[in-house]
């Protein structure tokens, strides 16, 4: 079984489970899928990728709240919101000089989820975090399944060759 098929199988199964978990816990299922997406899209895999994805998602949530609260300081002055957004977007990118914050799309995913969740970071954050863990489980269980399948196929071939 190839890697893509293995990951597709585990992602399909765990996506269904995530949908149930999200509803059961009162979380945002769509935000959880954004957490999954962050892990899959991160160029680093394994625990390092999980840590980088978590740090960038969290930073995105924080940056979104800076924009939301900063813009609310002077709601009658619309230009302030635009200036704050521009400055924060710059900072969201430049922070990537730090290893744990090096996945810029993760930062923007966290911010966008917070905006879509209308600034309810207390709901967005656990939804993203649990979704991120599901993404880690989806990909790594798929890689495990592919490796196990390859090992089994190799053993079967050795048995055929000996016969």
Swiss-Prot record:
Membrane topology: Multi-pass membrane protein
Cellular component terms (Gene Ontology): plasma membrane
Keyword Transmembrane helix: yes
Keywords of this entry: Cell inner membrane, Cell membrane, Membrane, Transmembrane, Transmembrane helix
Keyword match Ribosomal protein: no
Family matches, as InterPro entries: DUF1097
Compartments reported by the entry: Cell inner membrane
UniProt cross-references to Pfam families, sorted A to Z: DUF1097 (PF06496)
Cystine connections: none
Residues spanning the membrane: 3-23, 25-45, 49-69, 72-92, 99-119, 123-143
Similarity remark: To E.coli YahC.
Protein name per the record: Inner membrane protein YcdZ
Organism: Escherichia coli (strain K12)
Gene this chain is encoded by: ycdZ
